[in-house]
Regions:
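Conserved hydrolase catalytic core segment
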Residues: 86-131
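Conserved acidic catalytic loop of the alpha/beta-hydrolase fold
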Residues: 70-88
Length: 294
């Protein structure tokens, strides 16, 4: 299995398969490259696919510091240099999208061909001028999710990660699976139900302090000013059953991005690429194989 060492001495793991134009898969918080296991073989039939484990995730190492989005963007820059990749397309799920936003803020779009965003917002927290942030379900309640709710979430996360990791795994699925008391209905049928035991086990493997540090990094960012600077074609995908962000988020992003299209996935939540891999893979292949970036 390939690894490379960053300039701060961290050994990072990545998967690589296929030949041709590079496509980089960036996973979300608490996940790993394994969360793209339904995409890698399909995409590798057409492209060279690289799927890194972000620092602190999967088989990659971490330090107690440098747990920031700026560092993750630098890790990505160094991985591209290590593999001598001068141009690539990126498929970015959740935190992976914030990494590519941070990457563009620091390094521009010069080495980017196209971008696919999976169920993500440019700003996690709601504010007076932003109503497309996280909802109250993130603190197990109805309504909005504010600063105090975020602190509560962090305290629960750090108190008992094994218990909270189950909540994380459930929350990336469908919002219709929750009742008014924010209780998850495991008996219901939904897309991707067969993956739930695996999602539980994978989520448990994370370190609470790593997750908390990256969550703070994510929740303090506002990438709205970056969107108009993204000069490459973008595909915005989201789950119509997502617990995370409303459709208005993607309408806003489409208006701010110079070249973007939006596709909603019925019956899917935050993990739409896991829940409906065939539709997702076909949609992404069509986008990546369409006319190249200008």
């Amino acid at each position: 299995m390939p690894f490379f060492t960053t300039d701060d001495g961290i050994c990072l793991h990545y998967q690589i398969s296929g030949k041709g134009t590079a496509v980089i898969l960036l996973h979300g918080l608490t996940a790993s490259s394994l969360y793209f296991q339904k995409q890698i073989p399909v995409l590798a039939a057409h492209f060279q696919v690289i799927a890194p484990d972000l620092r602190g995730h999967g088989q990659s190492e971490t330090l107690s510091d440098h747990l920031t989005l700026k560092r993750l963007a630098l890790d990505l820059k160094q991985l591209l240099a290590e593999l001598k990749i001068s141009k690539a397309s990126f498929i970015c799920w959740s935190m992976g999208a914030q990494i590519i936003f941070e990457y563009i803020r620091n390094y521009s779009c010069g080495d980017i061909e196209k971008i696919v965003i999976i169920d993500m917002t440019p700003k996690l927290m709601k504010s007076a001028d932003w109503n497309c942030g996280l909802p109250g379900i993130f603190s197990r309640k109805q309504g909005d999710f504010g600063h105090e709710d975020n602190l509560y979430l962090l305290s629960v996360m750090l108190d008992n990660w094994e218990a909270y990791s189950k909540v994380v795994a459930q929350r990336i699925l469908n919002k219709s699976l929750y009742n008014d008391k924010m209780e998850f209905n495991t008996a219901a049928d939904f897309k991707g139900k067969e993956d739930l035991p695996w999602l539980y086990e994978e989520a448990k493997k994370n370190k609470a302090w790593v997750v908390a540090a990256f969550w703070i990094a994510m929740s303090t960012q506002d990438y709205r000013p970056v969107l108009p600077t993204i000069s490459v074609p973008c595909l915005l995908t989201y789950g119509m059953e997502s617990n995370y962000y409303p459709p208005e988020n993607y309408e806003y992003m489409q208006k701010q991005l110079p070249d973007a299209r939006v596709i909603a996935f019925a019956g899917c939540g935050h993990a739409l690429h896991i829940q409906d891999p065939e539709l997702f893979n076909n949609t992404v292949l069509e986008f990546l194989q369409s006319c190249p970036a200008k």
